[in-house]
């Protein structure tokens, strides 16, 4: 290892490394919000999956794996936040550094893969409702999920057996995205995990919208909302991942043109990359919205909870007001009755035709 200004040799590769104080000021609050909301959303989703789903279906199995990937990514954010707060001085040793980088990469990739699978599953159920893929068993869906996890782990496991911590002056650098004069497997996967799923998600979303409009189903208010939701999912995916990918491509172009002879030219793009990289974690924070709209079990669960709260409140009112009502009127029949809708749980499932088709 050698050091000259921002120049650093990492594992035999010439790299440019920066410790920008702006990262320590700006990113920790952003990651903190992503952690809090992501933990609440995905934690609640996993709780519903594990304890409140009456039955499992293939589409729900894919959603469950998406929630697992998002949750595992979210719980790594406090360690990444501490790394930023310490201005790129990792305090927990080499093995925890590898584990954190592996978990971030694996679960970011896993989240993207299962989000893509959910889009493909929805595509077949809406556009090709009689396709044999719509009839796969829960066992087959579980096997597919395990296979996808195996691929994800295989593509990112190199982070576990490679020493990712490097001494940088008086600090320990822990990062998998240093600016180095080489095109690594990690960089290739970072680009591929965006462009390939993006193409699939855009194709599936476009075909779903076109199919619904061909059947003239898009005139229904609930179907319009479903179409809007499909578009929002695609837009959020682009907003979360495109900025960091675009900046990374810019870095590759600068490396091609200038090598690492002058590290100063990379200062601004390095700051831009790690800033936009924090947007990718926002996708895991927003995925609970996908669970809510993709399966009627989630809105039904929340409706049941709200109804139970209202029922308890309404049941308490007659007890509190009963003596007063009798005293004033002399007739207990004047006491208000509880609406029947609050006395019964909502039926399963009460969703619009399009959304219901995604969970059958």
Swiss-Prot record:
Read off the InterPro entries from this record. Answer: GPCR_Rhodpsn, GPCR_Rhodpsn_7TM, HCARs
Q: Name one GO cellular component term.
A: plasma membrane
Q: Which residues carry this modification: Phosphoserine?
A: 325
Q: List the disulfide bonds.
A: 97-174
Q: Which UniProt keywords apply?
A: Apoptosis, Cell membrane, Disulfide bond, G-protein coupled receptor, Membrane, Phosphoprotein, Receptor, Transducer, Transmembrane, Transmembrane helix
Compositional bias ranges of the Polar residues kind: 321-336
User: Which parts of the sequence lie on the Cytoplasmic side of the lipid bilayer?
Assistant: 52-60, 120-140, 211-226, 292-360
On tissue specificity, the annotation reads: Expressed in adipose tissue, lung and spleen.
Q: Which family does it belong to?
A: Belongs to the G-protein coupled receptor 1 family.
Q: How does it sit in the membrane?
A: Multi-pass membrane protein
**What is its subcellular localisation?**
Cell membrane
Checking PROSITE patterns in the record gives: G_PROTEIN_RECEP_F1_1 (PS00237), G_PROTEIN_RECEP_F1_2 (PS50262)
Instruction: Mark the transmembrane ranges.
Output: 31-51, 61-81, 99-119, 141-161, 190-210, 227-247, 271-291
Stretch list, region Disordered:
320-360
Which purpose does this protein serve, as stated in its record? Acts as a high affinity receptor for both nicotinic acid (also known as niacin) and (D)-beta-hydroxybutyrate and mediates increased adiponectin secretion and decreased lipolysis through G(i)-protein-mediated inhibition of adenylyl cyclase. This pharmacological effect requires nicotinic acid doses that are much higher than those provided by a normal diet. Mediates nicotinic acid-induced apoptosis in mature neutrophils.
Which protein, by its recorded name, is this? Hydroxycarboxylic acid receptor 2
Species of origin reads: Rattus norvegicus
An example Gene Ontology biological process: G protein-coupled receptor signaling pathway
Topological domains on the Extracellular side lie at 1-30, 82-98, 162-189, 248-270
Q: Which GO terms describe its molecular function?
A: GTP binding; nicotinic acid receptor activity; purinergic nucleotide receptor activity
